[in-house]
Amino acid sequence: MIRHGRASAGWDTALDPDLDDLGRAQSQEVADQLQSLQLSNIITSPLSRCQQTAEPLASMWNLSPRVCTEVSEIPSPHGVAMSDRIVWLRNAMQGTWSDLGQEYVSYRDQITDFVRNIQTDTVIFSHFIAINAVVGGVLGDDRLVILSLDNCSVTIFERDATGNLSLVQGGHEADTLIR
């Protein structure tokens, strides 16, 4: 799972921002890093920043990424104003899925199950919280944030023959600003 490149706008100013120049450069770097794998399956969140991050690798492999809502970013609660979304997210990131309630526990479980049920080696372009949801689901850790994943970091999971998912490698961490 790859976190998208840096977005051009923050969570409190845009619902679906594109990548900025640095984000586009990060996308090319991760594509160059993964090019030799030559897998046959790419999945991306429907959000622009993930689709744009997937483009360089998909082009190298001559693939069309499959857009899946199952790997989308955590939804903000209904009724939270755009300008208040970042405050909600930063507060949520300090706690657990259980603190947020059953809707969010279900989000974590659904994204973990989706990844667990993928049968072939796949690159998934997704989001900070979504990738952490899978990490937590695999490790049995209820915290929203387990890894401070940098933009375009690569987190590797492995699925065994019986369908068990394990964390092989956490992505590169940084003091990522959630904006």
Feature map (PLM): residue ranges:
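Short active-site segment of divalent metal-dependent hydrolases/proteases
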Residues: A7, A130-I131
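Generic beta-sheet signal
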Residues: T120-I129
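Active-site signature of alpha/beta-hydrolase-fold catalytic machinery across serine-
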Residues: P56, A133, G137
